[in-house]
Amino acid sequence: MGPPSASPHRECIPWQGLLLTASLLNFWNPPTTAKLTIESMPLSVAEGKEVLLLVHNLPQHLFGYSWYKGERVDGNSLIVGYVIGTQQATPGAAYSGRETIYTNASLLIQNVTQNDIGFYTLQVIKSDLVNEEATGQFHVYQENAPGLPVGAVAGIVTGVLVGVALVAALVCFLLLAKTGRTSIQRDLKEQQPQALAPGRGPSHSSAFSMSPLSTAQAPLPNPRTAASIYEELLKHDTNIYCRMDHKAEVAS
């Protein structure tokens, strides 16, 4: 009679035990909680606009939360506090009237200014009175600052170039018009007869202009000479008539 065979249920394989132990450890290991974070929407905001400090991974079983201006929790920098049980918000020393806190702990800041630039700290108070904090920040810029969009810069450059071109065209037009007018006047002057120099001959203009002067400068006749001429005219020459009669008789 042979030896009794060993029961297979009594054998223990080592690697199966290790797998079972690892499974139990994974089952009892609590999941890792996500870290509380703050996201600025947007990160860079124009002056006069609004920004939202959005909270991610907010823990459960909270008593309340508070917002502070800066990187640390300080009573003098408290903006607003919120109690979940009473749903009551209490403003702090740093409250400006432009902040709004929501039930999910997010903070809205309206009409931002340059003084709002910097860090903001959120403190959440759990039911077991264990606090957790997170910090976020945002930037503020002026809308009319030099950092303009590419489209706006291109539009400004195009407008300047068009204006310069129009001014240049206007200047060229005025120069051409002035040059043409000068050329026409020069041609008209060349077509007109040139006046003779003094002593080279009279012209119509010179004759008319000088005639009064010549009349004024002409010597007046001597009164005695005029009387002698008048006396000669009064004398009758009878010999003339005699000669005329004599010639008539000869002809007959």
Curated annotation (Swiss-Prot):
<dbReference type="GO" id="GO:0005886">
    <property type="term" value="C:plasma membrane"/>
</dbReference>
<dbReference type="GO" id="GO:1990782">
    <property type="term" value="F:protein tyrosine kinase binding"/>
</dbReference>
<keyword id="KW-1133">Transmembrane helix</keyword>
<dbReference type="InterPro" id="IPR013783">
    <property type="entry name" value="Ig-like_fold"/>
</dbReference>
<feature type="domain" description="Ig-like V-type">
    <location>
        <begin position="35"/>
        <end position="142"/>
    </location>
</feature>
<protein>
    <recommendedName>
        <fullName>Cell adhesion molecule CEACAM3</fullName>
    </recommendedName>
</protein>
<comment type="function">
    <text>Major granulocyte receptor mediating recognition and efficient opsonin-independent phagocytosis of CEACAM-binding microorganisms, including Neissiria, Moxarella and Haemophilus species, thus playing an important role in the clearance of pathogens by the innate immune system. Responsible for RAC1 stimulation in the course of pathogen phagocytosis.</text>
</comment>
<feature type="glycosylation site" description="N-linked (GlcNAc...) asparagine">
    <location>
        <position position="104"/>
    </location>
</feature>
<keyword id="KW-0732">Signal</keyword>
<feature type="compositionally biased region" description="Polar residues">
    <location>
        <begin position="203"/>
        <end position="217"/>
    </location>
</feature>
<dbReference type="Pfam" id="PF07686">
    <property type="entry name" value="V-set"/>
</dbReference>
<keyword id="KW-0325">Glycoprotein</keyword>
<dbReference type="GO" id="GO:0009986">
    <property type="term" value="C:cell surface"/>
</dbReference>
<keyword id="KW-0472">Membrane</keyword>
<feature type="region of interest" description="Disordered">
    <location>
        <begin position="188"/>
        <end position="221"/>
    </location>
</feature>
<dbReference type="InterPro" id="IPR013106">
    <property type="entry name" value="Ig_V-set"/>
</dbReference>
<feature type="topological domain" description="Extracellular">
    <location>
        <begin position="35"/>
        <end position="155"/>
    </location>
</feature>
<comment type="similarity">
    <text>Belongs to the immunoglobulin superfamily. CEA family.</text>
</comment>
<feature type="transmembrane region" description="Helical">
    <location>
        <begin position="156"/>
        <end position="176"/>
    </location>
</feature>
<feature type="signal peptide">
    <location>
        <begin position="1"/>
        <end position="34"/>
    </location>
</feature>
<feature type="topological domain" description="Cytoplasmic">
    <location>
        <begin position="177"/>
        <end position="252"/>
    </location>
</feature>
<keyword id="KW-0393">Immunoglobulin domain</keyword>
<dbReference type="GO" id="GO:0002682">
    <property type="term" value="P:regulation of immune system process"/>
</dbReference>
<comment type="subunit">
    <text>Interacts with S100A9/calprotectin. This interaction is calcium-dependent, but independent of CEACAM3 phosphorylation.</text>
</comment>
<dbReference type="GO" id="GO:0007165">
    <property type="term" value="P:signal transduction"/>
</dbReference>
<dbReference type="GO" id="GO:0035579">
    <property type="term" value="C:specific granule membrane"/>
</dbReference>
<dbReference type="InterPro" id="IPR036179">
    <property type="entry name" value="Ig-like_dom_sf"/>
</dbReference>
<dbReference type="InterPro" id="IPR050831">
    <property type="entry name" value="CEA_cell_adhesion"/>
</dbReference>
<feature type="glycosylation site" description="N-linked (GlcNAc...) asparagine">
    <location>
        <position position="111"/>
    </location>
</feature>
<keyword id="KW-0597">Phosphoprotein</keyword>
<keyword id="KW-0812">Transmembrane</keyword>
